[in-house]
Curated annotation (Swiss-Prot):
This is Uncharacterized urease accessory protein UreF-like. Keywords: Chaperone, Cytoplasm, Nickel insertion, Nucleus. InterPro entries: UreF, UreF_sf. The keyword Isomerase does not apply. It comes from Schizosaccharomyces pombe (strain 972 / ATCC 24843) (Fission yeast). It is found in: Cytoplasm; Nucleus. Belongs to the UreF family.
Length: 235
């Protein structure tokens, strides 16, 4: 495990809005959700955000935790995660972001990490994804990469949720629902901080078998995204 200063340094890098995960291309169902509301305003967004975070907690965080705890089982964990996905759009987004993170690992991060068993598992995983023998789902890759970097499980879960919250808020700005100032105040708000902290704590006690969709209509909105007459995002 890395020391606290190094963990903080890596956390700031991983949570940077310029971190090249292509998150700006996805609204994670927000665009479709807003398009199906009678009133497309900030109140609709604030209804969406906590429900979306809770969905990610229950659909993704058990996999993040399992991948961090047992990186050598990345293939089995990925197969399980794939089997639980109920929305093809969400599946596509997950694999695209996972592949992006694997590229970041290979081209930017791996040079600064001492070779360990986790390092070897991750390199093997990357080769399998490149040869199309694995899918590279984002929560699996995230868990293994954070373990290779020496981040704690709690920090790994928190950063995953924070990244999702930032992506949703950023999408809301581009959709002209939030101003740039509201983007900052939303993320800095004590309720958002409490939601992220409490959710990451819940994730620590989750098992793969706890994976479930807590907000079923989110899958419907994401599934209808390609049917929107006009759209900015890919999901």
């Amino acid at each position: 495990m890395t020391d606290s200063q190094t963990e903080t340094h890596l956390s700031l890098i991983l949570s940077d809005t310029a971190f090249p995960l292509s998150s700006f291309s996805y609204s994670y169902g927000l665009e479709s959700y807003l398009s199906h509301q009678q009133v497309r305003d900030v109140n609709a967004f604030f209804n969406f955000l906590p429900l979306s975070l809770n969905s990610v907690l229950h659909t993704n965080l058990p996999t993040v935790k399992a991948a961090w705890e047992s990186p050598q089982q990345y293939s089995e964990i990925e197969d399980f995660f794939e089997s639980t996905q109920t929305c093809t759009i969400a599946q596509k987004v997950s694999t695209m972001q996972g592949k992006s993170l694997l590229n970041i690992w290979t081209k930017s991060l791996s040079f600064f990490v001492t070779s360990t068993d986790v390092f070897k598992y991750l390199d093997e995983y990357e080769r399998r994804v490149r040869s199309k023998k694995a899918l590279g789902h984002f929560p699996v890759v995230w868990g293994v990469v954070c373990r290779a970097l020496g981040l704690s499980l709690e920090r790994t879960c928190y950063l995953f949720l924070l990244g999702h919250a930032k992506s949703i808020c950023s999408a809301a700005v581009r959709l002209d629902v939030l101003t740039s100032f509201q983007y900052v105040s939303t993320l800095a708000h004590p309720q958002t901080e409490s939601l992220l902290r409490d959710s990451s704590q819940l994730a620590l006690n989750m098992q793969l078998e706890d994976t479930a969709q807590s907000w079923y209509t989110l899958d419907l909105w994401q599934g209808r995204h390609s049917l929107l007459y006009s759209r900015i995002f890919n999901s």
